[in-house]
Amino acid sequence: MKQTTLQLPVMPRRRFVATGVGAAALLAMAPSALASDDLLEHALSPRMIGSDDAPIRVAEYYSMTCGHCADFHNDTFPKVKSKLIDEGIVRFEMRPFPLDGLALRAHALVRAVPEAKFFPMVKMLLAKQPVWVRADDPVTELQKMARLAGVSADEFNGIMRNRPLLEGIVDLRQKGADDWK
């Protein structure tokens, strides 16, 4: 079967009510990938959901602080997942495209946790985006969210100071910008 890659624009949808649905899924998981020596390789690897045999590939470039991206993930993505991804029609890849320093830190966090936590954590952070993005101290709020995923304060601080990880995410962003000029 011929595979096709499709880039979908992220479009604004109605405002959402932040929920803690993703938080419950995160509470039960341990942060084992945070302690591994190959954190950088793990964190910069592709994040995909859906069948390897899906005939359509979708790559979404998103920013953790983008309101439109949050709207898409809170309002539209559940429908895309149930109708296209879960049915084996689409394989969906999420690619980081941080628009600011806070988004860069949030991307570093979600990419540093074990892969099984990635999608639930992205879901939680985007659902609760107004809480942490608009806070007086957004990094502290992000750290509170990280605790729900079992990320200790030391692990969180290590992720935030991991220059190769942060630079790797910026490189992924730049590659996306260069590839889709």
Regions found by a protein language model. Name each.
Residues 1-12, 22-31:
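N-terminal secretory signal peptides
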Residues 2, 6-8, 36, 63, ...:
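C-terminal cap of thioredoxin/glutaredoxin-like
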Residues 40-56:
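A short beta-strand-turn-helix
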Residues 53-67:
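Short active-site neighborhood of thiol/selenol oxidoreductases, capturing the structured segment around
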Residues 62-64, 70-147, 152:
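Structural alpha/beta surface segment adjacent to cysteine/selenocysteine redox centers
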